[in-house]
Amino acid sequence: MAAYEAIANRPGAYRVVLEERAEGVYVNVFADTSSNAPYIDILQSDLAMAKRACRQDYGIEEHQWRRIADVDWHAPEPRE
């Protein structure tokens, strides 16, 4: 799956990472530059909806997104 990152640089939302998964796209919000994990994660139905929500909520424009290595905050649990 793919992941995308943008710097919002707003109070309480320094960075946003979109994480594509089978169930949809997680919008992971990081509070500041020292945050190691998101403090908010909102599930959107698809990438377009996630980007629209980020534009509305955090002012992130399409050109600000960059593809990054896949992240695993919501990776499926390994099967035993």
Q: What are the roles of these predicted feature ranges?
A:
Residues 2-5, 28-29, 51-52:
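Intrinsically disordered, low-complexity boundary segments flanking structured domains
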Residues 5-8, 21-22, 43-46:
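A short linear-motif detector with a strong N-terminal bias
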Residues 17-18, 37-47, 77-78:
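Short amphipathic beta-strand/extended segments with alternating polar/hydrophobic composition
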Residues 1-11, 64-77:
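Negatively charged, low-complexity tracts enriched in Asp/Glu with abundant Ser/Thr
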Residues 12-38:
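Short aromatic-glycine-(Arg/Gly/Cys) micro-motifs in beta-strand/loop hairpins
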